[in-house]
């Protein structure tokens, strides 16, 4: 029977519940247990697809086209297991489902209430993951902080869930803060005690405490928390700050987290194999060749807006024994401040995705600089569209060329709306989303990097290259090296006269893994190393 681990958070938000959940997933998988991780988000949006990156960070897209919380990216990267739309649940989606059932008459005229209808729907979503994926363990992260009014239906649902499924099949893990107070020179347990008290008032007694702290727990703290929170001392697990999130599974393994989880769930204790993960962390900390990469975007004030891009770069840097340094460049300020000043001496330039006209001219200027200066360049989604506009204006001779998204009256709409998007009014969940096949041109840079002729990548866009300009681009030196299998949609463009210039309509960052860096990011950093007269082992990773 499937076991369930619920992860709640207390005291403050952004305490690291997602990393703890993902790390536990890695520890269980290292013991040959199958795992799926579910995120329950308390906001009323149906999904984060229409939310501002400044508020929410990046939107992570799954193979089946779900627009989800960025934590699902952590889940995939740590467990190397694809997530789906079943792994992301919001208050909005719960209420939407319940209201739809009420409109259909499913409740037979009954009064629809938070208990039992909302809580039953939450429990059904949890069970659906277990039924669909049949994992040994489902880890469920509850978004928000205990005490938030938005989280109450989820907490009530998981309280009921433990009673219905059975205590030996369910475990409650609470991630909390144990702060160091400099003026007192002491660690304080009171915030954790109050957080657990709040949780217990709802009817949930945590089985394990994960104690977030900026330093090792001082002697006596574990015993004090054990006494006041009614948790066995061996289940009070310190989680001090780490230099990298990829070190967290190893730290939690040393503290015995997985052992306690298996004990409490009556699962067999198995020997873990974390050798590859240990080697990954050693390579990360052993990297000694610095390489600076510029990320040119309009959401750079919040680095989480480009989280998967940064992680994909980091995966490749680890494989290439490079110390990755990110130079954040605000595309809104780029033209005014000067492109050369902002991008001088960078090893590579990445222009990631986005929506809307704001900051686009800065992205185009950065792409022109990369092309003219021979700096390795990778464009992603909107980054490819901006590369098309840049080429159209400066090489193909199409004055005022633009995307129809930014200028509906442009004389040269080199980027236009996908035909199937013409009559769509709603914004949420209506783009070209999810995993699609792409056919690569023989002998192209893309084929050389991937080592395959047909690839599969995740998409999130409404606009595409306008095929009316395809021949002109080919005649002026661009190459179209990736298309949809029917040849209709342009997915990859290259400039072969450049050391490394490639742009793609999809989001390769979502499929990069710590132990399997994505070929495009690996190729970018390898080209940057070559440009810097550094040795690099090979063009594609060998994992």
UniProtKB/Swiss-Prot annotation:
Allosterically activated by GTP, when glutamine is the substrate; GTP has no effect on the reaction when ammonia is the substrate. The allosteric effector GTP functions by stabilizing the protein conformation that binds the tetrahedral intermediate(s) formed during glutamine hydrolysis. Inhibited by the product CTP, via allosteric rather than competitive inhibition. GO terms for molecular function: ATP binding; CTP synthase activity; glutaminase activity; identical protein binding; metal ion binding. The active site is at residues 381, 507, 509. The keyword Acetylation does not apply. UTP binds at residues 13, 188-193, 224. Pathway: Pyrimidine metabolism; CTP biosynthesis via de novo pathway; CTP from UDP: step 2/2. It comes from the Bacteria. Belongs to the CTP synthase family. CTPSs have evolved a hybrid strategy for distinguishing between UTP and CTP. The overlapping regions of the product feedback inhibitory and substrate sites recognize a common feature in both compounds, the triphosphate moiety. To differentiate isosteric substrate and product pyrimidine rings, an additional pocket far from the expected kinase/ligase catalytic site, specifically recognizes the cytosine and ribose portions of the product inhibitor. Catalyzes the ATP-dependent amination of UTP to CTP with either L-glutamine or ammonia as the source of nitrogen. Regulates intracellular CTP levels through interactions with the four ribonucleotide triphosphates. This is CTP synthase. It comes from Thermosynechococcus vestitus (strain NIES-2133 / IAM M-273 / BP-1).
């Amino acid at each position: 029977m499937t076991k369930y681990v619920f992860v709640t958070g207390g005291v403050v938000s952004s305490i690291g519940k997602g990393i703890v959940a993902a790390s536990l997933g890695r520890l269980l998988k290292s013991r040959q247990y199958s795992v799926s991780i579910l995120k329950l988000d308390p906001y009323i949006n149906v999904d984060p697809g229409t939310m501002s990156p400044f508020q929410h960070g990046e939107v992570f897209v799954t193979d089946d086209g779900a627009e989800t919380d960025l934590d699902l990216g952590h889940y995939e990267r740590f467990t190397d297991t694809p997530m789906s739309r079943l792994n992301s649940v919001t208050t909005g989606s719960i209420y939407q489902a319940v209201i739809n059932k009420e409109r259909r008459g499913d409740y037979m005229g009954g009064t629809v209430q938070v208990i039992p209808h909302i809580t039953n729907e939450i429990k059904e979503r949890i069970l659906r993951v277990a039924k669909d994926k049949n994992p040994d363990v489902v880890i469920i992260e509850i978004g928000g902080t205990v005490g938030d009014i938005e989280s109450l239906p989820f907490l009530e649902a998981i309280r009921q869930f433990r009673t219905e499924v059975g205590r030996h099949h369910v475990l409650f893990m609470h991630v909390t803060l144990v702060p160091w107070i400099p003026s007192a020179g002491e660690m304080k347990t009171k915030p954790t005690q109050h957080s657990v008290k709040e949780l217990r008032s709802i009817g949930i007694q945590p089985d394990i405490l994960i104690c977030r702290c900026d330093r090792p727990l001082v002697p006596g703290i574990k015993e004090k928390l054990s006494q006041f929170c009614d948790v066995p001392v061996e289940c009070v697990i310190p989680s001090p700050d780490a230099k990298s999130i990829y070190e967290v599974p190893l730290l939690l393994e040393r503290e015995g987290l997985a052992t306690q989880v298996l004990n409490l769930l009556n699962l067999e204790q198995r020997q873990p194999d974390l050798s590859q993960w240990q080697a990954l962390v050693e390579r990360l900390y052993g990297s000694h060749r610095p390489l600076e990469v510029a990320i040119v975007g309009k959401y750079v004030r919040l680095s989480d807006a480009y989280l998967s891009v940064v992680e994909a770069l980091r995966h490749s840097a680890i494989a290439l024994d490079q110390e990755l340094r990110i130079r954040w460049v605000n595309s809104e300020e780029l033209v005014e401040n000067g492109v050369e000043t902002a991008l001088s001496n960078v090893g590579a330039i990445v222009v990631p995705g986005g929506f809307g006209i704001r900051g686009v001219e800065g992205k185009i200027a950065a792409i022109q600089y990369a092309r003219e200066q021979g700096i390795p360049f990778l464009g992603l989604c909107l980054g490819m569209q901006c590369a098309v506009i840049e080429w159209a204006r400066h090489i193909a001779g199409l004055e005022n060329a633009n995307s129809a998204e930014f200028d509906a009256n442009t004389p040269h709409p080199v980027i236009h709306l996908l035909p199937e998007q013409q009559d769509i009014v709603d914004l949420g969940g209506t783009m070209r989303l999810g995993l699609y096949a792409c056919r690569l041109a023989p002998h192209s840079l893309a084929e050389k990097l991937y080592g395959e002729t047909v690839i599969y990548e995740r998409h999130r866009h409404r606009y595409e290259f306008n095929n009316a300009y395809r021949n002109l681009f080919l005649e002026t030196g661009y190459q179209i090296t990736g298309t949809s299998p029917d040849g209709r949609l342009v997915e990859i463009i290259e400039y072969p006269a450049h050391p490394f210039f490639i742009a793609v309509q999809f989001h390769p960052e979502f499929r990069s893994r710590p132990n399997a860096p994505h070929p495009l990011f690996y190729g970018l950093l390898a080209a940057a190393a070559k440009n810097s007269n550094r040795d690099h082992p090979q063009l594609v990773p060998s994992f």
